[in-house]
Amino acid sequence: KDGKLIFRDEPLDDVFRKIGQVYNADIVVMDKDLAKHMYRATFQGETLDEILRLMKLTVPMKYIEKTFEKAMPNGVYSKRYIEVVRL
């Protein structure tokens, strides 16, 4: 893997699932029509925050972030949870 995320006309639901896997985040598209929105982009080296900011420039969306923590045997586990909604 070369650190690139490449999307070629993929539904946003799939795009956010793949981004979430890479950045250890649960990203949920709350609007069914928006989830089907086809997206094309290449990201390389951006942080999750940068990717979300860039996507807002071309997709009619906003996002609400909630971070949750879960106690694990070896310490506290933190994961980002992000809801994506239509503007």
Model-derived segments and spans:
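A residue-level detector for the "anchor" residue at the start of short, highly conserved motifs
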Residues: 1-87
